[in-house]
Amino acid sequence: MLNICHINLAKGFRGGERQTELLIKALGQQDNVSQKVIVRKDSPLVDRLSGVDAQLSLHPVSKPYLFHARHVKDCSLLHVHEAKAGQFAYLATRIYKRPYLITRRVPNPIKNNALTRRVYSGAERIVALSDAIREVLTSYDANLDPLVIPSMVSSLPVNPQASEEIRHQYRNKFLVGHAGALVNHHKGQQYIVEAAAALQQDYPQIHFLLLGRGRDEEWLKRMAAGLNNLEFLDFRENLGDFLAAFDLFVFPSLHEGLGSVLLDAMQFRLPIVASRVGGIPEIIEHGKNGLLISSGDSRALAESILYLYRNAAIRRDLAENAYQVSLNYHPHSSARRYLLLYREILSGPARMGTAAKG
């Protein structure tokens, strides 16, 4: 029996946590796998993973996290899903000698301090979500040799009646949707607001819906004051109902590891306008399954929205091609790749300071 300990100590629930959840659930459907999950007590993952699988045990923890290192004692291998988890795993393995791997989900520069370097050099393997993240990792340390395993589609549930009610509420509107944390330096929502302002007078039938919350919410709302073609709808658990109701999905990020919500939009056969940054061009080919624009360019965003609004046939072609691409990102495929990686790590020579084979 392979006993994997997943560690995610993130405070909220964003794309990385959704991907953690998807992988855990997909691994739970494999034979001879048991899983532990170490998360913060207040993490939404506690509720989302409760009762999922008889071979899954949850361990909600509070600070200081290292006091809970005993939970890794009987694990074959630790799987790190974000930065704080990496520090926890590195220190816990000094005590219990368990190997760990890291999945890196963001393209941000990695901190150049002694502890962080030890965290990465101490990992048996590093996984990147995209080639863009892989380049960040190899620039940081040429010895890391990351493996690329991309994000997964979420296969979000849809209530057809709820989706139809959304369409009815915005009848005669062309719905341009966006979903993401309202953190402008990352997701670039100010460019959606600016595009909405540019289109409002001549194209009032184009209506923008932004789903999410975050530290820049009030600032963005002040920026959008006076616009009657844009609404902020907070974070919604029923994202699938909205994706099914949208006509177009926009994602003007300033940097992005891959943008897993784009895979969800693709699965819903939505035409997409997104920034040409990070790992996004690895899943969206301009003119084939979406449109790519330069980051920070609200004019290009508005022009692309208007172009697709006017060209229904092109929207349909982009959307269908996007759906076909999304078929390559099923969680079961990622789970199988991770299982092979887990077994490769456990059957090979351990790094100095780790010894467990499970």
Residue ranges and their predicted role:
Residues 286-287, 291-298, 307-312, 327:
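Conserved acidic donor-binding segment of nucleotide-sugar-dependent glycosyltransferases
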Residues 80-86:
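Short His-centered aromatic/hydrophobic patch
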Residues 72, 100-128, 140:
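A conserved, positively charged/aromatic
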Residues 3-7, 169-187, 193-196:
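Conserved donor-binding/catalytic core segment of Leloir-type glycosyltransferases
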Residues 123-146, 153:
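A short, active-site helix/loop in glycosyltransferases that binds the activated sugar's phosphate group
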Residues 38-39, 271-274, 284:
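Short hydrophobic beta-strand element within catalytic cores of glycosyltransferases
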Residues 14-25, 183-198, 215-218, 291, ...:
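A conserved mid-protein helix/loop that constitutes part of the nucleotide-sugar donor-binding site
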Residues 235, 254:
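Aromatic "clamp/platform" in nucleotide-sugar-dependent glycosyltransferases that forms part
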